[in-house]
Swiss-Prot record:
PANTHER family, per database record: SUGAR KINASE (PTHR10196), XYLULOSE KINASE (PTHR10196:SF57)
Protein name per the record: Xylulose kinase
Family affiliation: Belongs to the FGGY kinase family.
Remarks, miscellaneous: Present with 3460 molecules/cell in log phase SD medium.
Entry EC no(s): 2.7.1.17
Length: 600
């Protein structure tokens, strides 16, 4: 039934477009530029990639960047050359670029490009018949700096402190901009350049993020910042939807040049379409003369556009680290996570929570279990014992809790520590710390449960009331504190996501995913899929919907469009809704709060 409905809806969308129409999604990441193509049925039909270190070795980057101590940057010219190269690959493959109706994409977040006063006139050359490559027209004189800070840069501790002092601390910074001040965020990076490179800063007429840099190249003129990506700058007042006067003044006060607002082109764009692709790409590569460019956005923002995520849906990426993305209509910021304006849903936000200790912490427990098994010392990558322990309910661990942080953790913000405790299930209070549990196998279950429970309690303030309730006898008036949030336990007992989507390497592990699903407690299903192209694919979907919506061919919002037309056959439905197990973990919320208090 579901398949027939989806097929009918897909045909309806297909009927609004010409046959054999295509949509491109770029992914300009740190190490490569990928370009993905889908057809009108949302099927991936072609892909090309340029790996910077391998395909453009003359830039002498290491994994796409230059590293000088804490300063990590990328050569901007390399991106221009990569764009020509990836489109040349499409041309060589005889892909019909003349049937591409729209393009969009994803770019590494936070990086900044510093255009000179000559940039606009040089970009105008892209609207004439091309005779040479991009680097000839958009030459080095187009830029006041030849490199762009990369998100891995951590040289701005001083500037982050100045930012937070300007606003009144990390909590007020998060309230204003959606995040506390971070090394990689664009505002502190701009401030550093204004302070340490005054000549380059004064030569800068316009500052772009990587996203609107690429959009500008494609349309042949400078375009404003894309609003969702601008939320990763520590400069944008999200509630007021404008740049913060105080933070712009901080940058202006550090330079003779008092024009930061003008450099940022005054305000981000809110348009679905930035313009038509410029003549350079039409003449050189055969693009359709009416091909539209939807503004590029940031990589994490494009990721949520690659899946049919609606309000109260959660995406859990289980990799070396754990990242949780969710769609919410609640603006509830915290210094320990990030909030961005949603790139395609008005009046919605993307929440992002990043944990440092993910797979590596679990692997340590796995290895310890394997070393105890006879003749298995060499098979430390075998998950059999670990998985059996995670799913084994024969031995109760209901009064046990542990945190396993072999590395310093981001959420909560603490140094490396492992700690195991026994708690009173009736009160939730910690009774004692223990060096080990009665069975080492309990560590496997407890590490997965505590990781999942941390995700659950931290997404709770961003979820709508789901009318959930606990069957356990708990004191719902107990005040629970996680990070900067302090509220009664009842506030954590009536919030559940609708759907949870699992991606990443560890999502292939059935035991880990099942336990995460039990703890998080989605009410309308749990799903798993592989997403090697998520950023570029999100760009494809954004391009397609933006064109159709802007041209009045469809009237549905992005989330409904993607839910109706998503290729659900690539998605695996896993782990049925489990109300009983979700309720079981309610008794561990207070103990987790109490345990985290002892870590600070």
């Amino acid at each position: 039934m579901l398949c027939s409905v989806i097929q009918r809806q897909t045909r309806e969308v297909s009927n609004t477009m010409s046959l054999d129409s295509y949509y491109l999604g770029f992914d300009l990441s740190t190490q490569q530029l990928k370009c993905l193509a889908i057809n009108q049925d949302l099927k991936i039909v072609h892909s090309e990639t340029v790996e910077f270190e391998k395909d453009l070795p003359h830039y002498h980057t290491k994994k796409g960047v230059y590293i000088h101590g804490d300063t990590i940057e990328c050569p901007v010219a390399m991106w221009l050359e990569a764009l020509d190269l990836v489109l040349s690959k499409y041309r060589e493959a005889k892909f019909p670029l003349n049937k591409v109706m729209a393009v969009s994409g994803s770019c590494q977040q936070h990086g900044s490009v510093y255009w000179s006063s000559q940039a606009e006139s040089l970009l105008e050359q892209l609207n004439k018949k091309p005779e040479k490559d991009l680097l000839h027209y958009v030459s080095s004189v187009a830029f006041a700096r030849q490199t762009a800070p990369n998100w891995q840069d951590h040289s701005t501790a001083k500037q982050c402190q100045e930012f937070e002092e300007c606003i009144g601390g990390p909590e007020k910074m998060a309230q204003l901009t959606g995040s506390r001040a971070h090394f990689r965020f664009t505002g502190p990076q701009i401030l550093k350049i204004a302070q340490l490179e005054p000549e380059a800063y004064e030569k800068t007429k316009t500052i772009s993020l990587v996203s609107n840099f690429l959009t500008s190249i494609l349309v042949g003129h400078l375009v404003e910042l894309e609003e969702a990506d601008a939320c990763g700058m520590n400069l944008y007042d999200i509630r007021e939807r404008k740049f913060s006067d105080e933070l712009l003044h901080l940058i202006d006060s550090s330079s003779k040049d008092k024009t930061i607002r003008q450099k940022l082109m005054r305000a981000p764009m809110k348009n679905l379409i930035a313009g038509t692709i410029c003549k350079y790409f039409i003449e050189k590569y055969g693009f359709n003369t009416n091909c539209k460019v939807s503004p590029m956005t940031g990589d994490n923002l494009a990721t949520i556009c690659s899946l049919p995520l609606r309000k109260n849906d959660v995406l859990v990426s289980l990799g070396t680290s754990t990242t949780v993305l969710l769609v919410t209509d609640k603006y509830h910021p915290s210094p320990n996570y990030h909030l961005f304006i949603h790139p395609t849903l008005p009046n919605h936000y993307m929440g992002m929570i990043c944990y440092c200790n993910g797979s590596l912490a679990r692997e340590r427990i796995r290895d310890e279990l394997n070393k105890e098994r006879e003749n298995n010392y060499e098979k430390t990558n075998d998950w059999t014992l670990f998985n059996q322990a995670v799913l084994d309910d024969s031995e109760s661990s209901e009064n046990e809790l542990g945190v396993y942080f072999p590395l310093g953790e981001i959420v909560p913000s603490v140094k490396a520590i492992n700690k195991r405790v026994i708690f009173n299930p009736k009160t939730g209070m910690i009774e004692r710390e223990v060096a080990k549990f009665k069975d080492k196998r309990h560590d496997a279950k407890n590490i997965v449960e505590s990781q999942a429970l941390s995700c659950r309690v931290r997404i709770s303030p961003l979820l709508s009331d789901s009318n959930a309730s606990s069957q356990q006898r708990l004191n719902e008036d107990t005040i629970v504190k996680f990070d900067y949030d302090e509220s009664p336990l009842r506030d954590y007992l009536n919030k559940r996501p609708e759907r949870t989507f699992f991606v990443g390497g560890a999502s292939k592990n059935d035991a880990i995913v099942k336990k995460f699903a039990q703890v998080i407690g989605a009410t309308k299903g749990n799903f798993r899929l592989e997403t090697p192209n998520s950023c570029a694919l999100g760009g494809c979907y954004k391009a397609m919907w933006s064109l159709l919506y802007d041209s009045n061919k469809i009237a549905v919002p992005f989330d409904k469009f993607l839910n109706d037309n998503f290729p659900w056959h690539v998605m695996e439905s896993i782990s049925d809704v489990d109300n009983e197990n979700w309720d079981r973990y309610n008794s561990k919320i207070v103990p987790l709060s109490e345990l985290e208090k002892t870590l600070i």
